[in-house]
């Protein structure tokens, strides 16, 4: 029970990032930089309390991972601007699960048992259908919101997903294969946050207006850090499968938050579509967690 309660923290912390950042305001460049600065402050505090040993390999992996993460987060913030948080969030999370899962299976042979392949591919099919419903619009009475551009949103979502997936592969697979380096979240978080700041500056082409939005979004970076700490604690208390499952449920928080707190408009049909999409997404994520537990 304790592990489940701990897992609820990253669910709400990470799930709230999209709509909290958009509530604070600013463009994607300001949101990303603010978030990374907040993450750096959080990581520095953790480092000073824990004082882990940092080798050059760990620092390099963390820095590159942070750079890739920043690309992913910048793209995600942009996709939210163009499609809305309630649409972009499930599409982003789901695409990461599917593409990351497929690469893990075919490139790194993470599934070895027949039951893993059966449940895994069912999960991915469920996720794909969930994508469809999450983005589906009411053909008879579509709500037109100013600033929406699904083409630009999907483009941003594409490079966002690539950034996130490569970052996860680097940490989970390539760090061991290339450098034979093992690390935990509390050790890697500081060098990663340095890479995150550099990545945010690169994505902003070093031309980011240091307005109030940047400083407000530092709170979002702290939320990200808190989610990481509790994710680690939940995995220790309840196992990786439970922690992973609950972390993916954050999509419920972000979707509902986008509608309730950002006033994203939906017709009754679209609300039904979103509900179906969420149920399918959660089902697919839980199935993938079961697949992980079978390994």
Curated annotation (Swiss-Prot):
It is found in: Cell membrane. GO terms for molecular function: carbohydrate transmembrane transporter activity. It holds the Pfam family Sugar_transport. The keyword Cell membrane applies. InterPro entries: Sugar_transport (IPR010651). The chain crosses the membrane at residues 4-26, 33-50, 54-72, 85-107, 117-135, 156-178, 188-206, 213-235, 241-263, 270-291. The keyword Transmembrane applies. One of its GO terms (cellular component) is plasma membrane. It is a multi-pass membrane protein. Keywords: Cell membrane, Membrane, Sugar transport, Transmembrane, Transmembrane helix, Transport. Belongs to the GRP transporter (TC 2.A.7.5) family. This is Putative sugar uptake protein YxfA.
């Amino acid at each position: 029970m304790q592990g489940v309660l701990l897992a609820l923290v990253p669910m709400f912390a990470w799930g709230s990032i999209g709509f909290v950042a958009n509530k604070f305001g600013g463009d994607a460049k300001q949101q990303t930089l603010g978030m990374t600065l907040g993450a750096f402050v959080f990581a520095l505090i953790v480092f000073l309390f824990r004082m882990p040993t940092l080798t050059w390999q760990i620092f390099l992996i963390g820095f590159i991972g942070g750079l890739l993460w920043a690309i992913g987060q910048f793209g995600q913030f942009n996709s939210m601007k163009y499609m809305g948080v309630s649409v972009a969030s499930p599409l982003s999370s789901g695409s990461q699960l599917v593409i990351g899962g497929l690469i893990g299976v075919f490139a790194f042979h993470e599934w070895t048992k027949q039951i893993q392949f059966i449940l895994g591919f069912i999960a991915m099919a469920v996720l794909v259908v969930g994508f469809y419903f999450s983005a589906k619009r009411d053909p008879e009475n579509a709500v037109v919101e100013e600033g929406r551009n699904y083409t630009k949103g999907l483009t941003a979502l594409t490079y966002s997903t690539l950034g996130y997936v490569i970052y996860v592969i680097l940490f989970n697979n390539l760090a061991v294969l290339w450098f034979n380096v093992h690390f935990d979240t509390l050790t890697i978080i500081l060098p990663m946050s340095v890479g995150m700041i550099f990545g945010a500056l690169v994505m902003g082409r070093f031309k980011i207006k240091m307005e109030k939005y940047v400083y407000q979004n530092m709170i979002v970076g702290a939320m990200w850090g808190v989610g990481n700490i509790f994710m680690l604690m939940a995995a220790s208390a309840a196992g990786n499968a439970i922690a992973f499952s609950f972390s993916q449920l954050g999509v419920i928080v972000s979707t509902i938050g986008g509608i309730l707190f950002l006033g994203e408009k939906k017709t009754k049909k679209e609300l039904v579509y979103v509900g179906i999409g969420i149920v399918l997404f959660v089902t697919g994520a839980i199935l993938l967690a079961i697949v992980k537990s079978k390994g």
